[in-house]
């Protein structure tokens, strides 16, 4: 039995545990499955394992609640940046991920919330229709890469349903379809106006989530590329609204949103 120190934080309801990489001792998958369980663990959408390297750099490994490893999480990265701001007073930090380095800068603190601007890389957007088993007709959407894979679908209905299915049901089918070799995150986007979108997220390895930093960026990038919206907009998910700025298709996208430290403690882990 091991005693694992953790911090829990959330960004617009998308919650993560932050654990020192050394504590994982090669047990990342099992630890994520156990500690992220909502009823028998601490409960979280994933774990950010923070590796403090000898050269002073910081690197994050993200494991989803199902134990699978992902390239990065925009919200998870922001949660780590908020923890480093609170615990070490860091106002700007570069965090390495398998999806590239993400630089996070503290903008302000509003009560318990840390508002952080994150440089999210240069999105790549490709319009692509797909055919999925069990779904009638082709699905029109866009493949977007923001350091991890996304498929974005534009919808008209207020409940975000499409092709006769709820967004949750359709998202589950698309996320694991063999067309996507490593699976994909799925977003359902409604354009509300030239400066505003709303969206829902089916996250690879987690299922429906209240928010996603990379999902916010992917949804915004697709809207900016394929719909008539501004290069600066508000993107509203179930858990809250984030601000996205993307000057042009060759520039780095900037994402601004809140993160809040929930608690810290020690967990018993047998694995």
Predicted segment positions?
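A glycine-rich beta-to-alpha transition motif near the start of alpha/beta enzyme domains, typified by
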Residues: 1-112, 152-271
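Active-site glycine-rich loop that binds ribose-phosphate moieties when present
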Residues: 2, 122-141, 167-169
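Membrane helix-loop-helix hairpins that form the core translocation module of multi-pass transporters
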Residues: 99-100, 114-123
């Amino acid at each position: 039995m091991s005693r694992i120190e953790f911090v829990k934080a959330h960004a617009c309801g998308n919650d993560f545990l932050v654990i020192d990489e050394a504590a994982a001792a090669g047990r990342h998958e099992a630890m994520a499955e156990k500690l992220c369980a909502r009823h028998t663990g601490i409960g979280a959408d994933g774990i950010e394992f923070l590796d403090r390297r000898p050269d002073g750099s910081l690197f994050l490994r993200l494991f989803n609640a199902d134990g699978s490893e992902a390239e990065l999480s925009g919200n998870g990265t922001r949660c780590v940046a908020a923890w480093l701001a609170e615990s070490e007073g860091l106002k700007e930090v570069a965090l390495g991920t398998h999806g590239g380095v993400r630089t996070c800068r503290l903008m302000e603190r509003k009560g318990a919330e840390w508002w952080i601007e994150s440089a999210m890389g240069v999105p790549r957007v490709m319009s692509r229709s797909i055919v999925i088993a069990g779904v009638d007709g082709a699905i029109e959407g866009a493949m977007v890469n923001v350091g991890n894979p996304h498929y974005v679908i534009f919808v008209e209905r207020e409940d975000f349903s499409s092709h006769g299915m709820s967004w949750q049901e359709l998202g589950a089918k698309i996320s694991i379809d063999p067309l996507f070799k490593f699976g994909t995150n799925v977003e359902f986007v409604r354009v509300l106006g030239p400066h505003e979108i709303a969206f829902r997220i089916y996250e690879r390895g987690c299922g429906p989530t209240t928010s996603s930093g990379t999902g916010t960026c992917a949804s915004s990038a697709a809207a900016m590329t394929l719909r008539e919206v501004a290069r600066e907009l508000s993107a509203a998910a179930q858990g809250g609204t984030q601000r996205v700025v993307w000057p042009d298709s060759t520039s780095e996208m900037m994402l601004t949103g809140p993160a809040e430290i929930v608690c810290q403690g020690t967990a018993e882990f047998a694995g």
